[in-house]
Amino acid sequence: MIFHPRPSPIAAAMYQLRDLGVDAIILHGPSGCCFRTARLLELDGVRVFTSNIDENAIVFGASENLKKALDYAIEYLKKELKKERPMIGIVGTCASMIIGEDLWEFVDDDRAIIIPVEVHSGSGDNTIGAIKAMESALKLGIIDEKEFERQKFLLKKATEVEKKRGMAKKEYIKPTYDDDLNEAIKVLKDLKEKDGKIACVLNAKKETAYLFAHPLIVLNKYFNCVNIANLDINKGLPKIRRDAQNILRRFKADYITGGLDEYPITGERAVEILKDLDVDAIVVSGVPHALPIEEIDKDIIKIGISDGPRTYHPIKEIYDYAIVELDAHAKVLGKRDIVKSRFGEILDYALE
């Protein structure tokens, strides 16, 4: 059992709907539910509405609340986006699911494409929310069976990585806001003086790659680097492919391990490539704990860069140095180009 806070299945469903290309999301619940996720998705171009369930609606039913929110959202989107049939996700919350609201009630509304996702924060692992979103998309014919099975497999692998090697591997992981930044920079400065060779590995989750590619781009300025990246432009939903294309304009990859949504499995491919390289250091940016880095020669310097204060200890257990980029996801939403990272900017200054 995990006792520290974990991401919500509701939020995961919302981000997955974003990847599917929805114009808007209606949260069928109280106005404050998933507030941070809703606000961040607005930065990414998704309009977020709420059915504003209150105590009366919890007692007497909230169908009328949802109808009013849907009517307003459709009218708003048609006016603002000039779309005849906007795509709208309707996402459940703890409140609406506990009182048994029917999210599929309005799915046949011909004014919009409606994708209902019956989910709440007690549904289980956060990836359950994303899987439920894909189940609805499959049922409505928005994706095919092959893509659904692919997404389901990857989402389950993502959970497996976190439970075995990441933030869900222990009952409680203390957040750490200090990292090994100074030590890592000293090691890299020494390596530069020796004309050392570095393997740069981008193994990032979806759009976070806009930030996690940055320190690797900086390293390429000062070192002889071999670049490995999960930037396959032929894998994933359209948004995922576009993000990979955008990053490849700025970051040249010598080896491609898979798509941006395949980070739970591309780490193994990256390690197979690394085993055949003659390098002095390996820098992995994004989700470094998805790489079985323990299989690499112990004499090679290993630096892992990831997001969030609870990732430090899991990464430090398998890497020589762990770097934490705070709020990486929030910084990249709405962006379509490289976003500067804390480590990358300090590294650039230190290596000049």
From Swiss-Prot:
EC number: 6.3.3.7
Keywords: ATP-binding, Iron, Iron-sulfur, Ligase, Metal-binding, Methanogenesis, Nucleotide-binding
Catalytic activity: Ni-sirohydrochlorin a,c-diamide + 3 AH2 + ATP + H2O = 15,17(3)-seco-F430-17(3)-acid + 3 A + ADP + phosphate
Claim: Nucleotide-binding is one of the keywords in the record: yes
Cofactor(s) annotated in UniProt: [4Fe-4S] cluster
Keyword flag Metal-binding: yes
Top-level EC class as recorded in UniProt: ligase
GO biological process, one term: methanogenesis
GO molecular function annotation: ATP binding; iron-sulfur cluster binding; ligase activity; metal ion binding; oxidoreductase activity
Domain of life from the UniProt record: Archaea
Record note on quaternary structure: Homodimer or monomer. The Ni-sirohydrochlorin a,c-diamide reductive cyclase complex is composed of a NifH homolog component CfbC and a NifD homolog component CfbD.
Family in the record: Belongs to the NifD/NifK/NifE/NifN family.
Function: Involved in the biosynthesis of the unique nickel-containing tetrapyrrole coenzyme F430, the prosthetic group of methyl-coenzyme M reductase (MCR), which plays a key role in methanogenesis and anaerobic methane oxidation. Catalyzes both the six-electron reduction of the tetrahydroporphyrin ring system and the gamma-lactamization of the c-acetamide side chain of Ni-sirohydrochlorin a,c-diamide to yield 15,17(3)-seco-F430-17(3)-acid (seco-F430), the last intermediate in the biosynthesis of the coenzyme F430.
Name the UniProt record assigns to this protein: Ni-sirohydrochlorin a,c-diamide reductive cyclase complex, component CfbD
The species this protein was found in: Methanocaldococcus jannaschii (strain ATCC 43067 / DSM 2661 / JAL-1 / JCM 10045 / NBRC 100440) (Methanococcus jannaschii)
